[in-house]
Amino acid sequence: MTDYHIRIRELPATDKPRERLRASGAAALADAELLAILLRVGVEGVNAIQLAQQLLVEFGGWSGLQRAGFEELAQRRGMGEAKTAQLKAALEIGRRLLLASGEERFQIRSPTDAAQLMQIEMSHLDQEQLRAICLDTKNRVQKIQTVYVGSLNASMVRIGEVFKEAIRLNSASIIVVHNHPSGDPTPSPEDIVVTRQMIEAGRLLDIDVLDHLVIGNGRFVSMRERGLAFIKP
């Protein structure tokens, strides 16, 4: 059986991603359409939108494409080095834009706000990292500091390092965030032990530990919301 593959240029103008973006704005486009604009062209038998859909499914969405190595993407049929470079550059722009909101004194009002600030960058890391978000009295971000790299372990984490920048900045509070490279954000017993130690140290330093978030693949857990290590109000 012969399959007839429609090229993007043969689609009606209302179905072409660039024309739809011009008419309706980028927010109106599906993920595959946005990615197709970056890719520009597909490969024999597959147009750019179809290639974009395949990539998003194959790699598990934007976070999977972020995690994928350059060579892994470049060797994929229909990609190559030029398309891979364009895609990686666009993903990095998105990451930096999100982090820039912290530099503009982004205000954190909920665990979701904190997770959105950190998730794009931290969900693709191969190693566990512990970071502290330093906040002022209005919960505005002062600085995000990486304080530890490696499996969270009560005997290895230096609690003083968690608060070092917060003390220097005279922060009112911190939110602690770490990732699980496995993708499962369920806090471990060790996570709970370390969190209790940080909460106690924060009390002594008069710096409130507002929450400890565990980041997974597209998901997160707020230990305060779960009542883990934190006393429920």
UniProtKB/Swiss-Prot annotation:
PROSITE patterns: MPN, UPF0758. A motif (JAMM motif) lies at residues 178-191. Zn(2+) binds at residues 178, 180, 191. Residues 107-229 form the MPN domain. Belongs to the UPF0758 family. This is UPF0758 protein Rcas_0037. The lineage of its organism: Bacteria, Bacillati, Chloroflexota, Chloroflexia, Chloroflexales. GO terms for biological process: proteolysis. Keywords: Hydrolase, Metal-binding, Metalloprotease, Protease, Zinc. GO terms for molecular function: metal ion binding; metallopeptidase activity. It comes from Roseiflexus castenholzii (strain DSM 13941 / HLO8). InterPro entries: MPN, RadC_JAB, RuvA_2-like, UPF0758, UPF0758_CS, UPF0758_N.
